[in-house]
Amino acid sequence: MACILHIETSTSLCSVAVSDDSHVIYHDEERTSEKGSAAERLGTMVDEAMSFTDSHAIPFDAVAVSCGPGSYTGLRIGVSMAKGLCYGRDLKLIAVPTLELLCVPVLLSEKLSISTLTSHLSPLASHLPDDALLCPMLDARRMEVYAGVYDRALKTVRPVQADVDDADTYREWLDQRPVFFFGPGAQKCMEAIGHPNARYIEGMEPLARWMQPLAERRLLSGQTEDVAYFEPFYLKDYVAKLPKKLL
């Protein structure tokens, strides 16, 4: 099986991982606060991951990168790093959609916690209801979130888009079945959605160590990217901010 380096930089939690023979054998995560520090730390983290594989004489076959949506700067840094590694080492490039990545720990774990607006935290059942839908969310600033809707097989029910967090956005699904909301953007939507079929899973963030099943599936099916022309899925155009201090 393949050895894959995984890179995730869509949020302020920068992470890398290495999988070999369908098992994660190395992972590292670090919260960053400044744009410059994110680029610097990612380079160091990748170097450390490669030192680990070199010490075990494990050659890489591919690099997988979380491709968005998410932080414009973070995605640009992560994708640039992945493309550089693939070009320099003649590796295959795999793009993993960030919101699908967020679903992986929810589908695999039996020890999550869920909440509603009317109950305290309680253990998640050993598996999700058969008709459950998953709605991973990333903060898109202001009153918006990046969100998609998926079934338990990760089939897209509604494509990714930037949503305004109001009560009507997900009503067509909530009126019919339970919908599980999670990810860094879910917290600010809890009160706005306010539906009895809404379930909230806390503590979910996109991490490189969860990329393995999605990346490996894409690699085995030949879903790799053109290293020269691949770009992140930003979804929204970048908006430059004015500096706080004017010269």
Where are these regions (language model features)?
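Short, basic and Ser/Thr-rich N-terminal targeting/leader segments
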Residues: 10-13, 87, 143, 228-229
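DPxDG-like acidic metal-binding loop motif
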Residues: 64-98
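A general structural signal for well-ordered alpha-helical segments in protein cores
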Residues: 39-46, 82, 208, 212
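Surface "functional belts" at beta-alpha junctions
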Residues: 23, 30-37, 92-206, 234, ...
